[in-house]
Structure formats: C-alpha cells, structure tokens
Amino acid sequence: MAEDSSIAATPAPAEGVISKTYHEVTQPFIDLWHAPRALWGVNLAYTIEGLSYFGILTYLAIHFSDFVFKGVEHSDVWSHEMVMVLTAGIAIAMVVLGFVPDKWGVRRALILAFVFLLVGRIIMSAAPTVLGLAPSGIWSPLHLLTMAGILLVVIGYGMYQPAAYAAVRKFTNPKTASMAYAMLYALMNLGSSLAMLAFLLRDDQFLGLGITGTFWVYTGLTLVSLLSTIFILSRKTVAEAIDRAKAETEAMGAAAQEAAAKSGEQKSKDDVATGPRKVPVTAWIILGAILVTAYFRLPEPGNYAGSLIVLLIPVVISLLPARMRNSTIQWIALHPLADPRFFFFIFALMPVQTLFTYNWLVLPQYISRAFAGGWIGEYYEVASNANPILIFILVPVITALTYKAKVYNMMVIGTLVMGASAFILAFGPTPITLLGYIVCMTVGEAMWSARFLQYATEIAPPERAGLYQGVAQLPWFLTKFLVPLLYSGQMMEKYCPADGPKNTESMWLIFGLIAVITPTALWLSRGWMMKGFKVKHEG
C-alpha cells in the first residue's frame, strides 16, 4: 500500500465541510425556485416520472412472479427476464430514439413520450383489472398484454430521457447548464424516494389497492406529467426559453467555443485519417464474450445460429473492399474500447454495478420473503426505496469530505465499501443487517459514482471526452441485461423462494464475492492504470 499512501482523503476544515454540504443539499431547491417557467415544466414532470417509473419497477418482479406467472415453474427466473425487457430495453431505446428531440423539438418529443408511457401503463394496469385477465401461464393473454404495455413504456422512456436532457440543454446557457442537470438528478432521486410510501396505497391495512391498483395510481401520475408538460411547456414558453438561452450563450462567447469545437473535430478527423489499421486485442475479447454468451444462453438451435453469425463478423470484414475494410478497422482501432486502460476500467466496474440491479430485481422480493410476518416484510417498499433519498443526502456530504482525494483512490475505496455491503446480509436477514447493507451500499455508491464520469473524462483524449463518457455507460446497460439473464432469478429461486426453506445467507455471500471483484481488480491494476495517466494523450 506504500504506493497509495494518498488514498485517505485530506480532511477539510469542519466549517468548510458543513458550509459546502449545506450549499450542495440546498442549492438544487434554491435553483428550482428561481428556475424559469420552461425548466419548471421539465422538472415537475421529471420528479413525478421518477416516482412513477421506480414505483412500478419496485413491484414489477413481484407482479410477474406472484401473479402473472402464478403456478408456473421457474416463475422467479421468468419474472426477472421480463423486468430485463423493461430496463435493458430502455437503454437500447434511448440509443435508437435519441434523435427524436433533435428532429421534432423537445416539446413534441416530451409530449409524445408521455403519450407512449401513459398508454403503456394503462394497458399494464387494465389487463388484470378492467379486462379481467387471469393468470394462465407463459404467453397467456395476461402475459402478452402486460408485455405489450411494457414495450410501449420502453419506447416512451427511450424518447423521454433524451428529450428531458435535450430540453435542459436548450433552455440553459453554459453557465447555468450544470446547475440544471444537477437539479434533474436531485429531483429524480427525490421523486423515486417517494415510492417508499407506496405501501399506503397497496397494503390492506391502508387503502388496500394491491399492486395492480397501485399501478393505476402511477398511471394517473403519468397523466399528470403529460398535462403539466402540455400546459406549462407551451409553444410560446419553449420558444422564449430557447431564444433567451441562445442570446445568453452568444453573449458569453459562443463563437469562440464553436471555433474550439470545430478545431477539436478537425483534429479528431486528422487522427482518424492517420489512425492505426490493426484490430485491437480488446475487440477480440468483446467478440469472444458475445460468442460465449450466444452459445450458452440462447436456446437450441438459436445458439448455433447466433454463434455462427458472431464468428462470421471478422470474416465479413476481411472480405470487404480494401477502402471500406480499412475504414472499418480504423473505426474499431480508434474506438474508446480500443484503449486498454479505458476498456479495463469500465468493465472492471461491472461486478460492483450488479448491486444496482438488485435494487429492483432482488431487494423487493428478498425483503418481502425473508422478512415475512413482520413490519419490514409487510411494508417492503420502505427499505427497497431508501437508497435514492440517502444518495440525495450523502453525495454532497461525502463530496465535501473527500474533495481533495484522488479520483482513482476514491473509485477503489468506494467500490470496496459498496461491494462489501453484500457481506452484511450474508449474516442473515435481520433489521440491523438490512439497515447496514442499505447504508453501507449507499455510502460506497456516493463515494465512487460521482467520480466515475470524472475519471472517464480524465482518461480520455481532450477532444473525445464526450464519446468516452457515452461509451462508459455500456457496462451499466450490460448489467441490466446480463444479471437477470444469467443468474438473479435462479438465485432467488434457489436461495429465497416464495415457499419453502430459505438460505439467503449463501445468496448474499455469492453476491458479495461477485461485487468485490471490482475493487480487487482496480487495486491490483493501480500501477498500470495510473502509469502515464496525466500525459498519455499529450504529444
């Protein structure tokens, strides 16, 4: 550890920490109060949608396993894969539909997104209630109609998230943009934390709506989001906000910034023209991983067809005309994933990022089953949704306490704290261990998540920082896809079934062993990762 003697953060003066923390916690609300009407239109709907999305997500695995797939063998496995369709599907949809706000305008994109979200949630809610569809196995009318609703939600959210951020970008100038983005993040956490109170709607001791009835409440909130967007974000309001932001940006020297951006683009083009023409080893690693996944996870005979397609990719590239082949290889060689340090960094984070997916795939079912018969199990929404409000509070506190710490060191310590949290639940399901897990995981997340994109930016060539930030999100998408596909449903079925003996200690021990791969890998590779870090793109 001699090489990392700077891991411990230099403590800030007490008054400075308190002042900085108070500022970070209260500033989003101050900014919200003074925000222009256009940003109010975005922020209000974003807060409500945070509650609606995460509220439904909390119940979704339980809704499928205990209701839609009632009596079906391996219902936990099937339910987790259905949740995967939503979460991974949204990640894909955002890539595919990200052009909508640019082409049609942010107001139209937001309204259209909420229409899709509303119709999708109406279908999900109406299938077992208004239409009276009963559980009758896999691919039953109830299952198919619920999935149809989810697919509409996927399309809607695929447009909504890019549109919300595009709106903030268009309604702000370079000076106020970071404040507006921070406000969105804070309000999303605030909105999603309100799902803690959903038991007041669901539980028989209160309103007794059940899960399907609570879905209707979230559907109604989606209608509120749609109407608020239509009336607050009027055409006149949007036009005035965009014109004002443009004028402010021009006054701040937008022309100089555009010239710098063009210079960066030209440099990037020059780099491409003279770039390497050798396929990097990282590309072969990715191809091999896709091949293994296709062969072992696709059902026969699809696994053979999928594997063959993967194997044909390099063959097809090699048979392309020389100019096209060279351009393709150059694109691969200059892609951020061709950078071995960046490749290692983002994929090394995947094990600890699996803990994020457990928040909706595992925790609601685990708490309701392992703590059955008590207050915690009955009102599982409280513990399942405690993370967002804790993140809202802890991120500015920990940022203030560790602002002098090195970014990479914070990544190592933060992922270690977060990964180790799973071992707490390996001691058994008790109120103390559950509280310890939630707090420890959230503290760890607050330590490293804020530094993640910062490190991804610093490791990137200056003119390609945005591209590196975008690609850095890839492992997060992969965990949404791979965790339910590979093991989360099987683990619940084996160690925490709805009925029968449970062994949740072993389940969380395995989860912990997976998660701590990240800090172990980051620490063991620290010398290589930091070697030439500050000068790797100079010269």
Language model features by range: what are they?
Residues M159-N173, I367, A446-P461:
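Intracellular juxtamembrane helix-capping segments at the cytosolic ends
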Residues T212-F231, T282-L287, G306-P314, K502-G527:
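Symmetry-related core transmembrane helices of the 12-TM Major Facilitator Superfamily/SLC fold
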